[in-house]
């Protein structure tokens, strides 16, 4: 269980880093998708 939580934390960190990179580059189509994803994982 703890390992799964650890993997999820790393995954979320990588995802938010990818999101920041997306904002800087030209993948605006991906941005709303990631935002929805992030809000659903927060719940």
From Swiss-Prot:
Keywords: Glycoprotein, Signal. Glycans are attached at residue 37. Residues 1-16 form the signal peptide. This is Uncharacterized protein 400R.
